[in-house]
Amino acid sequence: MTDDKDVLRDVWFGRIPTCFTLCQDEITEREAEPYYLLLPRVSYLTLVTDKVKKHFQKVMRQEDISEIWFEYEGTPLKWHYPIGLLFDLLASSSALPWNITVHFKSFPEKDLLHCPSKDAIEAHFMSCMKEADALKHKSQVINEMQKKDHKQLWMGLQNDRFDQFWAINRKLMEYPAEENGFRYIPFRIYQTTTERPFIQKLFRPVAADGQLHTLGDLLKEVCPSAVDPEDGEKKNQVMIHGIEPMLETPLQWLSEHLSYPDNFLHISIIPQPTD
């Protein structure tokens, strides 16, 4: 991969100032103060909120505590989506800090998966990495790794260790020089305006004539409404990690540098702010 390490670091160390507030319906023995935290964009809510959980449990009776879950303006937050994706999709036009409501009861079974332990997060994360490598290298790279390499990827994410993670992850970002890129680009496109969870299709980074496909090429093929407004007026923002990459950016470069730790490009299509 081309080595733009500063870009990789900027992506890894992206943070979202967040204010956690206990839901007013929760029964407490005394008033619960809000809890402030800088959330890592590349991580998962249930992986980085142990302190939040402990903070609010201090003011509650044990019998009133069941599984923790989070909500933003009425929308339950999926723990298996990266934090940065959740923010871009649901709150990117709102003022900071991001105001998240904490719940310990009335778990929304229809909207959220249960997260019984960190093992569930690890299993989800490794499943995504394996799926991404199946697309990129027919699973050859991830299958040739030892179990300790898989563990190092997970521990690097869990403990926020950039160098530990990238020492292994860089192998997943390599490809034979003669091929100019991966077999297919692992991506998922999310929209708030549709019930469909996300769009995911096979898409090659290089065209048949050898030209590098761009972000714009991908969107025109799999989500044309995002880039081709009927009246010519820009209706949407295309966001990855809180920024709007130029549509001319080669998809291969984006995949190497702006993928989340699970090796997917998580792309948010959100309505253009009206103000």
Swiss-Prot record:
One of its GO terms (biological process) is regulation of postsynaptic membrane neurotransmitter receptor levels. Pfam families: ATG5_HBR (PF20637), ATG5_UblA (PF20638), ATG5_UblB (PF04106). GO terms for molecular function: Atg8-family ligase activity. The modification N-acetylmethionine is found at M1. It is found in: Cytoplasm; Preautophagosomal structure membrane. There is a cross-link at K130 (Glycyl lysine isopeptide (Lys-Gly) (interchain with G-Cter in ATG12)). The keyword Aminoacyl-tRNA synthetase does not apply. It is a peripheral membrane protein. Conjugated to ATG12; which is essential for autophagy, but is not required for association with isolation membrane. Acetylated by EP300. Keywords: Acetylation, Apoptosis, Autophagy, Cytoplasm, Immunity, Isopeptide bond, Membrane, Ubl conjugation. GO terms for cellular component: Atg12-Atg5-Atg16 complex; autophagosome; axon; axoneme; glutamatergic synapse; mitochondria-associated endoplasmic reticulum membrane contact site; phagophore; phagophore assembly site membrane. InterPro entries: Atg5, ATG5_HBR, Atg5_HR, ATG5_UblA, Atg5_UblA_dom_sf, ATG5_UblB. Belongs to the ATG5 family. Forms a conjugate with ATG12. Part of the minor complex composed of 4 sets of ATG12-ATG5 and ATG16L1 (400 kDa); this complex interacts with ATG3 leading to disruption of ATG7 interaction and promotion of ATG8-like proteins lipidation. Forms an 800-kDa complex composed of ATG12-ATG5 and ATG16L2. The ATG12-ATG5 conjugate interacts with RAB33A; this interaction is bridged by ATG16L1 and promotes ATG12-ATG5-ATG16L1 complex recruitment to phagophores. Interacts with TECPR1; the interaction is direct and does not take place when ATG16L1 is associated with the ATG5-ATG12 conjugate. Involved in autophagic vesicle formation. Conjugation with ATG12, through a ubiquitin-like conjugating system involving ATG7 as an E1-like activating enzyme and ATG10 as an E2-like conjugating enzyme, is essential for its function. The ATG12-ATG5 conjugate acts as an E3-like enzyme which is required for lipidation of ATG8 family proteins and their association to the vesicle membranes. Involved in mitochondrial quality control after oxidative damage, and in subsequent cellular longevity. This is Autophagy protein 5. It comes from Pongo abelii (Sumatran orangutan).
